[in-house]
Structure formats: structure tokens, C-alpha cells
Amino acid sequence: MTHWPSPAKLNLFLYITGQRADGYHTLQTLFQFLDYGDTLHIEPRRDGEIHLLTPVNGVENEDNLIVRAAQLLMKIASESGRLPAGSGADISIEKRLPMGGGLGGGSSNAATVLVALNHLWQCGLSIDELATLGLTLGADVPVFVRGHAAFAEGVGEILTPVNPPEKWYLVAHPGVSIPTPVIFKDPQLPRNTPKRSIDTLLKCEFSNDCEVIARKRFREVDAALSWLLEYAPSRLTGTGACVFAEFDTESCARQVLEQAPEWLNAFVAKGVNLSPLHRELL
């Protein structure tokens, strides 16, 4: 049995710069990983079968991103003659990241499966090839595959590696799940934030265009942010529901965590520019 990190991400900022004819929104965002997340346990099989041993409630196995990623890699590697005969896997997950939280849990799971099985099966696909596969599973998958903090543009697929400060974060889940379409379909969502260079954006105060909608529509998000903002700069990650506050030291973050209200599920983690998944491969 092998063990693989599937880290969370934060959007340190997120600006929506337009909407394409196909309905997808264009954006500028800054991804950074956390040293906190899910863990995947993978045991290679020799009978060509993929088994997910820990099903997710309400999600059919064939719709689960873990299974879809494994089957996609199997298909593409087989078609290009790079899949050793009988390659399969038993996969289980220790889930710590909430669904609908804006921490990238499902995308991270898919990326970990692609990277881990490519290694375990010895398929030999490049990171570029794996990232291209990942994009067909979700816009956030490629950044997890590439494994480095990045400035993202387009619909999130145009990535430029960057090295923002590795701060400590108190991340809080307010107890609601926010489906991404709920935010992106809201008529009051800002959709025309001017595009700026990465250098300009890194000098500006960070914010998230989705935050005003999440706070308006979900009182739990509003309450969580109102509490965090009493202590430190805080904002929404992704389309929510998780919010985070940033601190210069772990001790400062933990002092605030100790005062968290009982209704708030929170943890402290460090921002890291190299993904824990890729540290595992070094």
C-alpha cells in the first residue's frame, strides 16, 4: 500500500475579468497549496481493474473524480502503448477537505491519482501530458498536477509559476456547501474586473470577486468572515464556502483558533509553494 498527499489550495486572490460565449468565466487568480489535505492510499492491482474502496455518499463511483482520473489515465496510456499489461489499483481516501468548500478537494484528488498512478504503473507520461488530461476533468486539476504555486488566467488553465510568501492560515468552514454554479450564475457577480499584470496584482491588496455574492447569499459565510476579520486580513477562497485569515506565525494563528466559536469548523495550516504531493516524489 502506498500513501499520497492530496493537498488543499487557497485562492489568495480571485478576479473575474469576463465571460466567454460558452458561458465560462475568465479570471485571474493566485493559487497556493496548504500543508493540509486528504490522503490517498493506493495498492496496485494486476488484473486491470480500478476499485474505489471508500465511496463518497451521494456520488456514484463512475462519477467520482478519483475513478474518472484513474480510468482516463488507463485509457490514454493504453492507447499510446505505455500501459503495462494488467495495470489496475485499489484506491481509498482519508477525507479531511469538505466538498463545496473552495479548497479544491476533488480536483486535488484527481491530480494525485494521475501523478501517483503514472508513477506506480510506470506509464512515463510527462507532467505536461498529465496536466492536459487533468484539464478535461476540471479547470483546477492542472495546478495540482504541476505542483507549484501559480498565477492562473483564462478559465484557470493558463499557469505561471510564482513564489508568494508562505504564510500561516486559519481556514474555517462555516458549515455550508456552495456549488460553484450558484456563485457564477448570480446576476450581481462582478464580471468585468480589469485585467492586470501579475506584478501589479502582487502589489495590490488581495480580494475575491466572489466574496460579496457568497456573503449575501449565505449568512454562515458572512458570519465566519465577520468573526475572522476581527483578528486578521481574511477572505473567501474560490467560490467558497471556506474562508481564511492570514498570519505571519503559527502561534498567532493558533491563538485565534483557540477562540473560534463552536459552530465554526477550523484548522491551521501553512501555505506552501511546492505541493506536498511533489515533495513526496523528490
Curated annotation (Swiss-Prot):
GO terms for biological process: isopentenyl diphosphate biosynthetic process, methylerythritol 4-phosphate pathway; terpenoid biosynthetic process. Keywords: ATP-binding, Isoprene biosynthesis, Kinase, Nucleotide-binding, Transferase. Pathway: Isoprenoid biosynthesis; isopentenyl diphosphate biosynthesis via DXP pathway; isopentenyl diphosphate from 1-deoxy-D-xylulose 5-phosphate: step 3/6. Its EC number is 2.7.1.148. It is an enzyme of class 2 (transferase). It comes from the Bacteria. The active site is at K9, D140. ATP binds at P98, M99, G100, G101, G102, L103, G104, G105, G106, S107, S108. Gene3D superfamilies: 3.30.230.10, GHMP kinase, C-terminal domain. Pfam families: GHMP_kinases_C, GHMP_kinases_N. One of its GO terms (molecular function) is 4-(cytidine 5'-diphospho)-2-C-methyl-D-erythritol kinase activity. Belongs to the GHMP kinase family. IspE subfamily. HAMAP family: IspE. Homodimer. PANTHER family: 4-DIPHOSPHOCYTIDYL-2-C-METHYL-D-ERYTHRITOL KINASE, CHLOROPLASTIC. Catalyzes the phosphorylation of the position 2 hydroxy group of 4-diphosphocytidyl-2C-methyl-D-erythritol. This is 4-diphosphocytidyl-2-C-methyl-D-erythritol kinase. The lineage of its organism: Bacteria, Pseudomonadati, Pseudomonadota, Gammaproteobacteria, Enterobacterales.
